[in-house]
């Protein structure tokens, strides 16, 4: 016979395998009282991860720790296998009464035969007896009574094991390790239930059941749905278990029926469940499911017990009332192990148990039930699927009569098995009950067939269980999930509520018939199918519903996969790597499918395209996937732009059968009219579009797009027919670029943008939002962004995005409406943006400005989440307007907000689809509104085309007022754009930000040559070296920061003088690059950190690039006197350059090398500044992770600067120091300065920087870090050792200094002080 896979010993499982592998079959078959009948759910382990829908009832052994408590397991409805485990009692053997011994001998003899007949393999002391399926000879009477079929997933069969009530004098049952001596008096095992069977068999020996007569016990809590996972241990805490005791006594006649034929009516197991089967009513479910019966049923239980008890007492001589049932019920509470139930409760329970049975039921039902049970049990032996009839009357057994009192009773019996106070003149001792209880416990423990490890904690201490797994013989069936067993429990007169089962598992093939006690559904496939579908639904839900309001696009190659490709702002800070061929971004299969999409144009109005013709931009081109929008259909029909055609907006100039179509855009009344009609709907959509939370997500695949998205998608689908490749978009968009980007870029539009986020708590003036819609006309949609510089504001924004409703979004020339109070339709970004410029002057609301050329690029059907310049519109709090200037060939926006008082750079990213397209970079400079008075600086052109700007801008404004664009205007814009591009070819521009010495902001921007092809221009960032330097245009306004107020210098706006910077000597080499000294043509010294990207390995280059992005992200957000200032970034060929403030003094290590160890007074001052900088980092959830002498720089004025944030990381959130949530699991840093937790990889938190500070102070004091005499690896092992003691400072240093270092080098990071605490240390007081 095939055996069930033997349960593994789980840390939290009571299913300890039987200890005696040598025990004879007789021993095995004679069940110790700890032996457990396990109702095992055979469902697949994968199904367990659904919602823990299976509630497995398991009874805990007496020995079990009360803490093993119960954990409610939701009843598994899938497939239930009843496995009977026969754990051996580990408790020391105790003497058996002569009477008991005799009974056992009888039982053993009978059981011996049975055991021999069914020789059971006892491999690891797991007895898996396959019970073949046989029809029950009799249907339990109680089950017949049951009218409302109930699905008892977890039937505690433990109660099925009969115990003789005659064993009154037996001290607590002891299951002894050596089963072979089972027959001996001293070692009487909890096989008392077997004994009871024999006793009962005395009345009807013919019904001998296997030691584990699989007596269906009512003690099965139906699903307790509220707890999908392991129930909280709160249920263990049952304050007044005593109140439940009376219920325990309610032994349901059902037990009689349920009890094996050997078991007398008295042996009826108390049903642990309320007749109504209400999971809420407190039905004690075996083990973890134990819900305590409610006291309202107390009297009924008592009465039933009294009746049953009296009857039992009468029959006790011949038929020992198996307190086994009591025991079982007790056992079920044993799971709870509440130590607060007095032993008297045990006695009460015993009495109740005997009383509960009604005499008449006892006789009639007992016999029939025994017969049924015996036959069933025997059948079980052969029938894997017949669970066992558990005809238990829920008659008044309200919620398992076994209450905590029994549980405690068991414990009390353990503690004082002799503390028997006979209740109701019962000669029964709680010891007997105890034994029975233990038997029940062991018997009723539930083994989870699939994941044994998932057993409740209570199971951990279970005695070894010989698992007679019913189904394992038909292992294929079991593996396929034996469908759940439906057990109906007829209740006498009491209404039954349908069993509550998890809805996900609700679909069952078999339904319980009133006339059938057990329904075994068909195979598991259906359930599994359900589970799979359910899981897929869950997956799709969880992954597709990430921060996306209603509609969102999931990037997938084939079927919609809920894989989201996120690229944080950090990852997009830098321009796309030049080494990356933009072509791969367009997957070939997408190109092939584009023609097909054209065929589907007619259907796009009603359905979304299955595949997007243009892949959304994912950070890694190699993993780029097409975007499959999962969008919710608009709640109400909208005209939007679905009714617009290309003929409404574009005039096809040139097209070929195979090539892309080239269109010229022009304003038409219908187009403008549509824009007007949708202006009122913008507010609704504003709430749908959300700014990236915490990070600029270049998540092209996941944009929060609203209903507009679906509409736009259809519009875009029409457009896709003309776009066979990414390049085609350029032709389409040329006019857009001319109209908008050039208008802005050539004019460097300095319009006032009011960016007050007063109510929003956002300090940064400009906001970037993923374009929520499909960027309809972005000419460079496919162009991968070249983000050269990004100012600290961006990182600030990562945490400070305003309410979505307040953001007005400028979609990338998409056919969507942008969101604004007086919003602009994204479809006419051109018109709307121009119009916004006008509104800007009126200060009604901040205008979203055309962010970058790339947003005007290829109309990607997906909004590639281009970060369009999002000017937050806050009409209520419009107190200031910052001028916004967009410079042509820059993809980045620099914004100086009054809140941050510093120049901030924004880089906008776009797809890089064509090889020649390195995106333009735009700079938006926010100026004080004061300088913008009288509209004098509405538009300013930078570049050599300043002349004529006024007239063109005036035309633009006029056209905006008329809300229509004329051919003349378009022509002017196009001519201006071309002229500007020609003049600015091969130019490298730099934005120099002059501030006070502490806040020198110098940002270098590179503009690339812009070759033209097919009337379209694509940009390549090329840094042209002139001799030893690079030409840089000073395109930035000079900001004088005084009194924390920025003063705009209008003269600087007109500065066109090129700035060169020359590379100088190497200042140092860090973990991620080499730092050079640079001199600009303005005479400023800067530090330039250059990192060469590996062109041969694209993946490695991307990884390195992301590291640099993260470093820059951090640097831009950090503004502190003790942290080096960030000036900008540049991508030159395959080298990334980061421009930083130059610290001429050098590092502390170099100072030590030059001057030797520092005096205490000196390093005390330095230490204080280091701590101040670190405290600032930690306050902003950043850990430096590489603090050492080489990374601490000294200004000539004595100011300390922390540098090299290549290892720095931002913590998940601002948690308590040392908490697991903000621990980083990677090892970075230098071994001599590494904290023990870093070396041990137990998590890197803020406190790890404190350790490094201690080592740095030690280094400043002695000239070398601690353990410098050791080899690097030896030092690592020493520091990582738990007992390794760090050396103290030499004796000649003050006690305060030594104590400071000692505190920093505290091995336990939880005891290590924080930076703020150390700043209050007495050692630093002298630094004042």
UniProtKB/Swiss-Prot annotation:
Q: Which family does it belong to?
A: Belongs to the protein kinase superfamily. STE Ser/Thr protein kinase family. STE20 subfamily.
Q: Which residues form the active site?
A: 1186 (proton acceptor)
Per the record, the gene is MAP3K19
Instruction: Please tell me the species this chain comes from.
Output: Homo sapiens
Q: Which residues bind ATP?
A: 1067-1075, 1089
Recorded protein name is Mitogen-activated protein kinase kinase kinase 19
The record's listing under CDD domains reads: STKc_YSK4 (cd06631)
Q: Which residues form the Protein kinase domain?
A: 1061-1324
Which branch of life, at top level?
Eukaryota
What Enzyme Commission number(s) does the record list for this chain?
A: 2.7.11.1
What's one GO MF term for it?
A: protein serine kinase activity
- List compositional bias (Basic and acidic residues) regions by residue number: 1-19, 344-361, 524-542
């Amino acid at each position: 016979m095939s055996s069930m896979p033997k349960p593994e010993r789980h840390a939290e499982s009571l299913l300890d395998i039987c200890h005696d592998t040598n025990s004879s079959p007789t021993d095995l078959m004679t069940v110790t009282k700890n032996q457990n009948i396990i109702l095992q759910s055979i469902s697949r382990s994968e199904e367990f991860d659904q919602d823990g829908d299976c509630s497995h009832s398991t009874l805990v052994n007496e020995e079990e720790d009360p803490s093993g408590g119960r954990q409610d397991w939701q009843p598994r409805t899938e497939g239930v296998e009843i496995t009977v485990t026969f754990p051996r009692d580990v408790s020391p053997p105790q003497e058996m009464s002569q009477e008991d011994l005799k009974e056992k001998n009888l039982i053993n003899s009978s059981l011996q035969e049975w055991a021999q007949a069914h020789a059971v393999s006892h491999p690891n002391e797991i007895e898996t007896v396959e019970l073949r399926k046989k029809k029950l000879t009799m249907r339990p009477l109680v089950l017949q009574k049951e009218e409302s079929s109930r699905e008892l997933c977890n039937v505690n069969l433990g109660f099925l094991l009969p115990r003789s009530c005659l064993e009154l004098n037996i001290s607590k049952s002891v299951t002894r390790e050596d089963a072979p001596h089972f027959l001996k008096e001293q070692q009487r095992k909890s096989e008392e239930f077997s004994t009871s069977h024999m006793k009962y068999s005395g009345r009807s020996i013919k019904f001998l059941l296997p030691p584990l007569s699989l007596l269906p016990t009512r003690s099965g809590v139906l699903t307790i749905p509220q707890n999908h996972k392991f129930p909280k241990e709160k249920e263990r805490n049952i304050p007044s278990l005593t109140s439940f005791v009376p219920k325990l006594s309610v032994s349901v006649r059902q037990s009689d029926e349920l009890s094996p034929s050997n078991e007398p009516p008295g042996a009826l197991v108390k049903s642990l469940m309320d007749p109504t089967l209400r999971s809420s009513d407190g039905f004690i479910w075996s083990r973890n499911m134990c819900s305590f019966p409610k006291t309202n049923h107390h009297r009924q239980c008592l009465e039933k017990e009294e009746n049953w008890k009296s009857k039992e007492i009468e029959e006790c001589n011949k038929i020992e009332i198996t307190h086994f049932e009591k025991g079982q019920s007790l056992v079920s509470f044993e799971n709870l192990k509440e130590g607060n139930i007095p032993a008297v409760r045990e006695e009460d329970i015993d009495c109740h148990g005997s009383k509960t049975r009604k005499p008449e039921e006892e006789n009639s039902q007992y016999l029939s039930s025994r017969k049924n049970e015996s036959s069933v049990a025997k059948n079980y032996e052969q029938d894997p699927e017949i669970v066992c009839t558990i005809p238990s009357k829920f008659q008044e057994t309200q919620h398992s009569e076994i209450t905590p009192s029994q549980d405690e009773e068991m414990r009390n019996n353990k503690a004082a098995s002799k503390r028997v106070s006979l209740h109701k003149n019962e000669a029964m001792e709680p010891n007997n009950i105890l034994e029975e209880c233990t038997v029940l416990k062991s018997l009723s423990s539930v083994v989870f067939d699939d994941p044994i490890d998932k057993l409740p904690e209570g199971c951990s201490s279970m005695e070894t269980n010989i698992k007679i797994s019913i189904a394992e013989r038909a292992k294929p069936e079991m593996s396929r999930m034996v469908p759940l067993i439906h057990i109906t429990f007829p209740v006498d007169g009491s209404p039954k509520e349908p069993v509550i089962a998890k809805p996900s598992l609700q679909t069952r093939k078999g339904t319980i018939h009133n006339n059938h006690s057990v329904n075994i559904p068909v195979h598991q496939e259906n359930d599994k199918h359900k589970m799979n579908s359910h899981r897929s639904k869950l997956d799709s839900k969880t992954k597709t519903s990430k921060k996306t309001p209603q509609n969102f696009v999931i990037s997938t190659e084939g079927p919609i996969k809920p894989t989201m490709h996120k690229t944080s702002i950090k990852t997009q800070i830098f321009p796309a790597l030049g080494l990356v061929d933009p072509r791969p971004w367009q997957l070939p299969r997408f190109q092939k499918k584009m023609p097909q999409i054209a065929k589907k144009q007619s259907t796009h109005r009603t359905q979304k395209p299955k595949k997007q013709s243009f892949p959304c931009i994912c950070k890694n081109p190699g993993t780029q996937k097409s975007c499959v929008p999962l969008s919710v259909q608009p709640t109400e029909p909208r005209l939007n732009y679905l009714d617009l055609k290309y003929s409404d907006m574009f005039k096809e100039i040139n097209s070929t059968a195979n090539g892309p179509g080239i269109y010229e855009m022009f304003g038409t009344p219908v187009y403008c009219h549509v824009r007007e009609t949708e202006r009122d709907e913008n507010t609704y959509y504003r709430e749908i579009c959300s700014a990236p939370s915490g990070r600029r997500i270049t998540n092209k695949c996941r944009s929060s797009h609203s209903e507009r998205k679906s509409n736009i998608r259809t519009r875009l689908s029409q457009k896709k027919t003309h776009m066979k490749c990414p390049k085609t978009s350029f032709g389409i968009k040329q006019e857009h670029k001319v109209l908008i980007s050039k208008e802005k870029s050539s004019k460097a539009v300095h319009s006032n943008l009011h960016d007050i986020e007063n109510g929003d708590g956002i300090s940064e003036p400009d906001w970037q939002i993923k374009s929520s819609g499909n960027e309809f006309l972005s000419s460079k949609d496919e162009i991968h962004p070249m983000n050269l510089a990004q100012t600290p504001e961006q990182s600030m924004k990562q945490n400070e995005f305003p309410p979505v409703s307040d953001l007005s979004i400028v979609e990338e020339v998409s056919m969507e409406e942008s969101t604004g109070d007086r919003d602009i339709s994204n479809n006419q970004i051109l018109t709307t943006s121009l119009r916004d410029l006008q509104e800007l002057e009126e200060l009604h609301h901040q205008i979203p400005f055309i962010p970058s050329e790339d947003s005007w690029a290829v109309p990607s059907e997906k909004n590639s989440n281009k970060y369009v310049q999002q000017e937050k519109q806050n009409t209520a709090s419009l107190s200031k307007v910052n001028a916004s200037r967009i410079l042509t060939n820059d993809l980045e926006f620099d914004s100086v907000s009054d809140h941050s008082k510093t120049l901030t750079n924004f880089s906008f990213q776009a797809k890089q689809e064509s090889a020649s397209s390195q995106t333009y970079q735009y700079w938006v400079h926010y100026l004080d509104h004061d300088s913008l008075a009288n509209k004098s600086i509405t538009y300013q052109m930078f570049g050599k085309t300043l002349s004529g700007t006024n007239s063109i801008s005036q035309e633009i404004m006029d056209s905006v007022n008329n809300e229509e664009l004329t051919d003349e205007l378009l022509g002017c814009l196009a001519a201006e754009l071309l002229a500007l591009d020609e003049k600015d070819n091969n130019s490298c521009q730099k934005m120099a930000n002059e501030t006070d010495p502490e806040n020198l902001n110098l940002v270098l921007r590179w503009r690339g040559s812009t070759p033209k092809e097919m009337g379209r221009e694509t940009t390549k960032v090329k840094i042209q070296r002139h001799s030893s330097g690079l030409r840089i245009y000073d395109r930035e306004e000079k900001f004088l920061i005084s009194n924390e107020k920025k003063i705009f210098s209008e003269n600087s706006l007109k500065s066109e003088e090129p700035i060169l910077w020359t590379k100088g000597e190497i200042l140092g080499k860090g973990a991620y690059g080499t730092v050079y000294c640079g001199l600009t043509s303005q005479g400023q010294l800067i530090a330039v950190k250059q990192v060469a990207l590996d062109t041969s390995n694209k993946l490695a280059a991307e990884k390195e690039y992301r590291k640099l992005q993260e470093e820059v992200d951090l640097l831009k957000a950090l503004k502190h006197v003790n942290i080096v200032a960030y000036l900008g970034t540049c991508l030159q060929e395959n080298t990334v350059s980061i421009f930083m403030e130059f610290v001429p003094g050098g590092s502390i290590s170099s100072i030590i090398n030059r001057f030797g160890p520092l005096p205490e007074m000196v390093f005390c001052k330095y230490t204080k500044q280091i701590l101040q900088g670190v405290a600032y980092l930690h306050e902003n959830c950043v850990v430096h992770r590489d603090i050492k002498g080489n990374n601490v720089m000294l200004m000539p004025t004595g100011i300390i600067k922390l540098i090299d944030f290549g290892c720095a990381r931002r913590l998940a959130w601002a948690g308590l120091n040392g908490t697991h949530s903000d621990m980083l699991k990677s090892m970075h840093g230098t071994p001599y300065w590494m904290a023990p937790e870093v070396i041990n990889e137990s998590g890197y938190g803020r406190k790890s920087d404190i350790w490094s500070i201690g080592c740095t102070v030690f280094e400043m004091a002695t000239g070398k870090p601690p353990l410098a005499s050791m080899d690097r690896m030896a030092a690592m092992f020493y520091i990582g050792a738990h007992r390794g003691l760090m050396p103290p400072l030499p004796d000649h240093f003050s006690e305060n200094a030594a104590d400071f270092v000692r505190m920093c080098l505290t091995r336990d990071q939880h005891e290590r002080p924080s930076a703020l605490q150390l700043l209050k240390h007495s050692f630093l007081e002298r630094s004042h």
